[in-house]
């Protein structure tokens, strides 16, 4: 620990989107190494998102926390489906007990609804395929963003 308090290690408030109202947090997601690369993390995030909207119909945001190495690999956007990934801590990160970068991931309600509609359509169009194949198609289709802007029109 370098002597700074958690508040001193946090990034300035103005660096984050205006998140307010009912905010969902899906907690931690750990997929065993033997189960990775088959689409499970992609599917679980979307399932939690859809169930959260059903349970809490006024939920305006979903936020999470992701560590630097996963951000470097694009996991928050191309797997977890978060369009926003903002630096949260650059230094001592208490949950891991390490000096590292941690990021706040976020998606607002409109983005969640568009993502759910888009992903359901993709699953329906590829009903004969395995989830891992659908995820690869989704990543190609979305690039780095989880939502197709054209669906907003």
Region annotations inferred by a language model:
Residues 57-139:
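Accessory, usually C-terminal, subdomains that scaffold auxiliary metal cofactors
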């Amino acid at each position: 620990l370098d002597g700074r308090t958690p508040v001193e290690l946090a990034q300035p408030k103005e660096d984050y989107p205006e998140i307010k109202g009912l905010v969902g947090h899906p907690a931690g997601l750990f997929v065993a190494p033997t189960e990775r690369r088959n689409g499970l993390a992609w599917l679980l995030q979307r399932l939690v998102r859809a169930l959260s909207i059903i349970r809490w119909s006024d939920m305006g945001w979903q936020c999470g926390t992701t560590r630097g190495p996963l951000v470097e690999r694009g996991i928050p956007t191309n797997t977890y489906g978060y369009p926003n990934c903002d630096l949260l801590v650059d230094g001592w990160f208490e949950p891991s007990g390490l000096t590292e970068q941690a990021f706040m991931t976020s998606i607002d309600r409109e983005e969640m609804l568009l993502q759910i509609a888009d992903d359901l359509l993709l699953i329906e169009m590829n009903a004969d395929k395995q989830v891992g194949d659908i995820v690869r198609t989704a990543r190609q289709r979305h690039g780095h963003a989880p939502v197709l802007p054209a669906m907003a029109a």
